[in-house]
Curated annotation (Swiss-Prot):
Protein name per its UniProtKB record: L-ascorbate peroxidase 1, cytosolic
Induction remarks: By stress and hormones. By infection with rice blast fungus (M.grisea). Circadian-regulation. Expression is higher during the light phase than during the dark phase. Induced by hydrogen peroxide in leaves.
Start and end residues of each stretch annotated as Disordered: 113-137
GO biological process: cellular response to oxidative stress; hydrogen peroxide catabolic process; response to reactive oxygen species
Reaction catalysis annotation: L-ascorbate + H2O2 = L-dehydroascorbate + 2 H2O
Pfam families according to UniProt: peroxidase (PF00141)
Sites where the protein binds K(+): T164, T180, N182, D187
Cofactor: heme b
Function: Plays a key role in hydrogen peroxide removal.
Note: Binds one cation per subunit; probably K(+), but might also be Ca(2+).
Encoding gene, per UniProt annotation: APX1
Length: 250
C-alpha cells in the first residue's frame, strides 16, 4: 500500500535519534531485545483492516491492553522504557514502541528496518483476541495476519523468523524454552532448526510446525534456511509493514 508519511519537525527528528541512542544502550545492557521486539509486534499486530482499529498507536501502555493474556510479561518492557520516555517527552509512545522493535533487531545483528516517525498516540486500546494463537495452524495464521492485518504469506513466514530472538516462558504463554541455540542473535537459525526437527531444549510451537506442513509456507522456510540474506530482505519488508499498519496510508 502506498504511504503518505507525515512531515515531522527537526525537533521531533532529534528526539527520535536521541531515543534511538538510548534504546541501543538499554537493549545492549539489559539483553532485552526479544522483549522489545515482542512489545513492538504485539502493539502493531492488533490492527484490523476492516474496522481500521488497533495497531501501533501507543495503547500498550494502558492497563487494559497489558492485561490481555497474549501480553503477559510486556508490563516489564513498558516499565523499562518509561525512564527514557520521561527524558524524551517529545516522541509519541506509538513511535517509541515501534522504534524499540527496530533497534532490537539491529542490536541483535539483524537487518536495519526502516523507520518513519509521525504515529500519533490513540487513547482506546483494541479488544482482546486479535493476536495470533501459538497453538493453532496455518488457517489461523492466515486469518490473523492475512484477513485481519492485510499481510501476505511471505510476510507471515518472514515474521515467524523473528522467533530467532527470545524464548517462551511457561508463566506467560504456557510454553517453555528458546527456538534457537542463541536467542539473542538475530539470524536465520529459526528456519534451519525448524527443518532439522525436534531437539531437546529447543522449542517448536504448533504455529511453527504449521509452516512446514503448509504447501505455500514450506518453500519459504526452505529458502530462508538456505539464504540468510534473502530472509533479512524479506524480514525487513515484513517488519516495516507490520510497524506501519494503519499509519500514513495514502
Amino acid at each position: 500500500m502506498a504511504k503518505n508519511y507525515p512531515v515531522v519537525s527537526a525537533e521531533y527528528q532529534e528526539a527520535v535519534e536521541k531515543a534511538r541512542q538510548k534504546l541501543r544502550a538499554l537493549i545492549a545492557e539489559k539483553s532485552c531485545a526479544p522483549l522489545m521486539l515482542r512489545l513492538a509486534w504485539h502493539s502493531a499486530g492488533t490492527f484490523d483492516v476492516s474496522s481500521k482499529t488497533g495497531g501501533p498507536f501507543g495503547t500498550m501502555k494502558t492497563p487494559a491492553e497489558l492485561s490481555h493474556a497474549a501480553n503477559a510479561g510486556l508490563d516489564i518492557a513498558v516499565r523499562m522504557l518509561e525512564p527514557i520516555k520521561e527524558e524524551i517527552p517529545t516522541i509519541s509512545y506509538a513511535d517509541f514502541y515501534q522504534l524499540a522493535g527496530v533497534v532490537a533487531v539491529e542490536v541483535s545483528g539483524g537487518p536495519a528496518v526502516p523507520f518513519h516517525p509521525g504515529r500519533e498516540d490513540k487513547p482506546a486500546p483494541p479488544p482482546e483476541g486479535r493476536l495470533p494463537d501459538a497453538t493453532k495452524g496455518s488457517d489461523h495464521l492466515r486469518q490473523v495476519f492475512g484477513a485481519q492485518m492485510g499481510l501476505s504469506d511471505q510476510d507471515i513466514v518472514a515474521l515467524s523468523g523473528g522467533h530467532t530472538l527470545g524464548r517462551c516462558h511457561k508463566e506467560r504463554s504456557g510454553f517453555e524454552g528458546p527456538w534457537t541455540r542463541n536467542p539473542l542473535q538475530f539470524d536465520n537459525s529459526y528456519f534451519t532448526e525448524l527443518l532439522s526437527g525436534d531437539k531437546e531444549g529447543l522449542l517448536q510451537l504448533p504455529s511453527d510446525k504449521a509452516l512446514l506442513s503448509d504447501p505455500a509456507f514450506r518453500p519459504l522456510v526452505e529458502k530462508y534456511a538456505a539464504d540468510e540474506k534473502a530472509f533479512f530482505e524479506d524480514y525487513k519488508e515484513a517488519h516495516l509493514k507490520l510497524s506501519e499498519l494503519g499509519f500514513a496510508d495514502a
